[in-house]
């Protein structure tokens, strides 16, 4: 039957043909699988990346597909910018959210702007993600 054959050729997502380059450019977050959702790798862009729970009509930069209701629709923000040396700097802040944003299990204060590095562990609601910084050429 043709059923098995058509399964092999999954339609390619055409909306972002440069996704691989895009991921490298400014890094990404890896959302850890939990009871509320599956593992997801979501690219970051330059500037403010608003991270939160994906839902209809909620236009944010990094929507996480999850049923975790303790995650706000706009929960935290990662700012990505280059310093004078051209090195990417990642800064985390709370959006602010109802349940808070945690970096390595420490809660961020409302005014906190915390510089984070590759491998930083961030928890929003009951969901955890890890920062994957972009590969940087050593100058």
Question: What spans do the regions from the language model cover?
Answer:
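Intrinsically disordered, low-complexity acidic Ser/Thr-rich regulatory segments
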Residues: 1-67, 79, 83-89, 133-139
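Forkhead-associated
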Residues: 45-128
């Amino acid at each position: 039957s043709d059923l098995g054959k058509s399964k092999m050729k999954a339609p390619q997502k055409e909306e972002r043909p440069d996704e691989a380059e895009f991921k490298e450019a400014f890094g990404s977050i890896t959302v850890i699988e939990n009871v509320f959702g599956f593992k997801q790798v979501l690219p970051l862009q330059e500037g403010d990346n608003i991270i939160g729970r994906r839902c209809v009509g909620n236009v944010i930069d990094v929507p996480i597909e999850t049923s975790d209701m303790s995650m706000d629709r706009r929960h935290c923000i990662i700012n990505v910018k280059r310093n004078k040396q051209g090195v990417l700097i990642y800064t985390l802040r709370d959006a602010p959210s109802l349940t808070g944003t945690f970096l390595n299990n420490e809660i961020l204060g409302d005014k906190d702007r915390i510089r984070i590095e590759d491998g930083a562990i961030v928890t929003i609601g009951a969901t955890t993600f890890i920062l994957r910084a972009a590969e940087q050429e050593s100058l």
